[in-house]
Amino acid sequence: MLRGLRIIAENKIGVLRDLTTIIAEEGGNITFAQTFLIKHGEHEGKALIYFEIEGGDFEKILERVKTFDYIIEIEEEESFERVFGKRVIILGGGALVSQVAIGAISEADRHNLRGERISVDTMPVVGEEEIAEAVKAVSRLHRAEVLVLAGGIMGGKITEEVKKLRKSGIRVISLSMFGSVPDVADVVISDPVMAGTLAVMHISEKAKFDLDRVKGRRI
């Protein structure tokens, strides 16, 4: 069973070492971790640490962590998988990104009403270097399942990053556009709204659409 643990602590050296040591000693396996400094509010300047832990004695972990004097808050949370679910990422030119988002959000709404959890992330971005960096970063995004690239022309460094991303297991949908990106994407779709819809259908556990069945095709 996966359980989330949110901690607010003083920003000091050794905190992560102490916490991960306790989790390991109590038999817990950390499947996801993130930490950042809080920029606003009552805990400004403090560290927010979040773990998703599989197995182990969770209650004992809580009990031991609470003993540290640098711990300000500690609370069990639902995992990101339960709250936000699988993620569709949409990158590219603003106007086309918004059209893809219409399809993706409308389809995700249908599935989420039935108990699934699918979220849609969008970022309008232009320029070869900028888009290439964004594509590269998708592999580091927790729970990202499929990327939709929306634009009029994409190639060069973007194409190379798309190739690498696909090797990591993340599917890539390209709108019909100029450049070499459509040649290396899993599928090319001419209608942006349909692209968003099919992206969500692919990662849904209840829909019957599978990108692997149309890989290499233009729709």
UniProtKB/Swiss-Prot annotation:
Taxonomic superkingdom: Archaea
Q: Name one Pfam family in it.
A: DUF5612
Question: Where is the ACT domain positioned along the sequence?
Answer: 4-79
Signal peptide stretch? none
Question: What Gene3D superfamilies would the database entry show?
Answer: 3.30.70.260, Hypothetical protein af1403, domain 2
> What name is this protein filed under?
Uncharacterized protein AF_1403
Q: Which species is the source of this protein?
A: Archaeoglobus fulgidus (strain ATCC 49558 / DSM 4304 / JCM 9628 / NBRC 100126 / VC-16)
Question: What is the phylogenetic placement of the source species in the record?
Answer: Archaea, Methanobacteriati, Methanobacteriota, Archaeoglobi, Archaeoglobales
